[in-house]
Every structure is written in structure tokens, then in C-alpha cells.
Amino acid sequence: MGQCSSATKMRRKRKREEECCRESMERRNKGCLAMVKERRSRFYIARRCILMLLCWHKYANS
């Protein structure tokens, strides 16, 4: 009877550890995704600004 109890406790402990690891990975993935979105938006803004400056320079002399 003691062995069954011990095995059950070990399974519960393993399950908790797996859940903890999964939650940690999900948090990390969300953080990475947020960082990628921010970088992408900053790059988009920079591209638009450069394009605007190039067009302004080209047509300002006309």
C-alpha cells in the first residue's frame, strides 16, 4: 500500500513540474512574440520615415 501511495505522489509531483515548465515556456513565448511585434512595427515606421524623406528630397527641388 505504501508503494502505491508513493507512486501516486511521484506522478502528481511530475505533473506539477510539467505544468510549471509549460507555463514558463508559454510566458517566454508571449514575451518573444511581443518583442517581435514591437520590432516589426518599429521597422515599419522607420521604413515609412525614410521613404517620406527620400520623396520629400526628390520633389522639394522641383
Swiss-Prot record:
Entries under InterPro entries matching the protein: DVL (IPR012552), DVL_RTFL_regulatory (IPR051525)
Keywords from the named record: Cell membrane, Developmental protein, Membrane, Transmembrane, Transmembrane helix
Membrane-topology descriptor: Single-pass membrane protein
TM annotation in the entry: 39-56
GO biological process: negative regulation of cell population proliferation; shoot system development
Keyword Transmembrane: yes
Location, primary (coarse class): membrane
Cellular localization per UniProt: Cell membrane
GO cellular component: plasma membrane
Chain positions covered by the region annotation Required for DVL/RTFL small polypeptide activity: 27-58
Protein purpose: Small polypeptide acting as a regulatory molecule which coordinates cellular responses required for differentiation, growth and development, probably by restricting polar cell proliferation in lateral organs and coordinating socket cell recruitment and differentiation at trichome sites.
Membership in a protein family: Belongs to the DVL/RTFL small polypeptides family.
Name the UniProt record assigns to this protein: Small polypeptide DEVIL 17
Gene: DVL17
